[in-house]
Amino acid sequence: MAKIVRFGVSIEEDLLENFDKIIEDKGYNSRSEAIRDLIRDYIIKEKWNLKKEKVAGSISLIYEHDVYGLSEKLTDIQHHYHDVIISTLHVHLDEKNCMEVILVRGKVEKIKRLYDELSSLKWVRHTNIAITDII
């Protein structure tokens, strides 16, 4: 485990009160835990913006399965990015809609291109990405 370093933060009283309420509602044991999570999230977002670091995560999308050629297009795109795709999960949500969850690991730039290609397809109703740092 990494060495813990103590440091001080100056903050407006009302901002701190709001923060304390949120961390209590979420069940954090301390402000330090919550601040560490916020810093980790910020670092991951910056890595995403810089497009240089390696990350892991998931891309989820919802689409209509009966649209001619869409399933094949999704498969073709995934084969093009086989080097960053770890695994996929396909779920039939109802008679019309499917959900695909794609687990990814690799350079941010390539994962972002995969996400953008999937998001831009017509009849893909919703896409979402969740990433984390590879420690």
From Swiss-Prot:
This is Putative nickel-responsive regulator. Keywords: DNA-binding, Metal-binding, Nickel, Transcription, Transcription regulation. It comes from the Bacteria. It comes from Dictyoglomus turgidum (strain DSM 6724 / Z-1310). Binds 1 nickel ion per subunit. The keyword Transcription applies. Transmembrane segments: none annotated. InterPro entries: Acetolactate_synth/TF_NikR_C (IPR027271), ACT-like_dom_sf (IPR045865), Arc_rbn_hlx_hlx (IPR013321), CopG (IPR002145), CopG/NikR_regulator (IPR050192), Ni_resp_reg_NikR (IPR022988), Ribbon_hlx_hlx (IPR010985), TF_NikR_Ni-bd_C (IPR014864). Transcriptional regulator. Its cofactor is Ni(2+). Gene3D superfamilies: ACT-like. Chain A, domain 2, Met repressor-like. Ni(2+) binds at H79, H90, H92, C98. One of its GO terms (biological process) is response to nickel cation. One of its GO terms (molecular function) is DNA-binding transcription factor activity. The keyword DNA-binding applies. Pfam families: NikR_C, RHH_1. Belongs to the transcriptional regulatory CopG/NikR family.
